[in-house]
């Protein structure tokens, strides 16, 4: 497997890999990583669909990319997906997945057309004082010292950040800024999370720094993530004869480990609670989704809280990874990520408006018609003075194809599940859906004497507790996550958010899909390049632009410095003034 960039590799079709007709594939899970791997097995690996098996412990595929209506409970979306125009693997695959709505078009086609016609941007990124515009006004509000802390982190070698927290590299100069408000709520970072991952995010999305304040860097699907992303992949795979095995738990994978060689030998299953085994040869490839950010999820209802129960159950992704990791140190250290659910949890809630009484309060903040079918909030709106650090969003409506006319479906999340609310004086994790809605309505500016009535009769709210939703953000060191294909592995790979790949960032659709593609290309030795992570971190134009954007448009020559440094800077500017370098610095407003 090798990386590539440019159209030469992007538009090429690889030859059929040698011996692929004698091979079979078994995939643990049906999340985005596993579905991506299966699609690449079909498209580029040219493996027969009937040789490909996906094991799903539940009745529905999709993993964390869900979106459904639970009978008697209501619509539920545990999370949302923010996409980027440089998710190179995602677009490489989705150009080949047919649209379910537009004949002759791909998922990429309809996504591209949609976001061209209706580009995303926010008209109100944050509120305070019960629904009043916080007037962050597109500003980062970073001091010179805060900017220097970001720059220092950007250039710090990875190994110096192993097992370090963000609090080890930033102080109040960053934490009190609008930058941190935007960043932590957009990506769900907590102060105690990994400084290494923070650095990787900075480098990965340096080309989008200017789009952080109003979220114009983002792109969204037409419907919820399940209907817009997962379902087209399922239909593609089913159309090629790929076999899905539901209500099938993978309880263990047994390996034969010899010097210089690692081989998966047996898959242990529970199929409808009956034990089964699949014996493996070198021609039987296994793709393992280890860990899981939505394991131990609980769903509440309008009248019931979502219970916080982080117990790791047999047959889930963490239990499986622990059993696998016990067999070889190259298989990672799951305990680094799943041992402290108080530091890895947050809550979300899906709110459905039942009439038009709440709509004016939404419209007052987003400054758009929520029923237009176009962008509504343009990403999350954060109540910056919320005790729960509450954020909420309404994407294009309807969010579900079967959504009743006149209803809106939106999403709320709180980063702090264990602190009291501002109207509901108890932690979010102890609240029913109705109570979470009441807290949200309070921060929308609804008159207090109307809040309970609206929450009870004009909305249905379903809370979700996810104890391990940011487990991958915990501080880590080399070897904590297994390589996609560990050294010496002959017939297996790790895929998903807890597999290690170069330069990309976790908690993204692209990361899951990249690991799936890399796994297939490595094990089948497909002769085509995997598109590399977009190289903006090496593009001087993006670096110069970000340096000025982070200072809210002020040139670097305005940095506070003593007279000696100012004199030296002036002399340096004089030397490059009539050169291409000088013109570049002027173009990007560095000087």
What are these regions (language model features)?
Residues 72-113:
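Conserved FAD-binding subdomain of flavin-dependent enzymes
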Residues 203-285, 290-291, 303-304, 309-318:
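Helical element adjacent to the flavin cofactor pocket in flavoenzyme catalytic cores
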Residues 42-69:
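Glycine-rich FAD pyrophosphate-binding loop
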Residues 37-50, 236, 240:
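A short, Lys/Arg-enriched amphipathic alpha-helix followed by its capping loop at the start of a domain
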Residues 100-207, 219-220:
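Rossmann-like flavin
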Residues 29-32:
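Glycine-rich Rossmann-fold phosphate-binding loop(s) that bind the pyrophosphate
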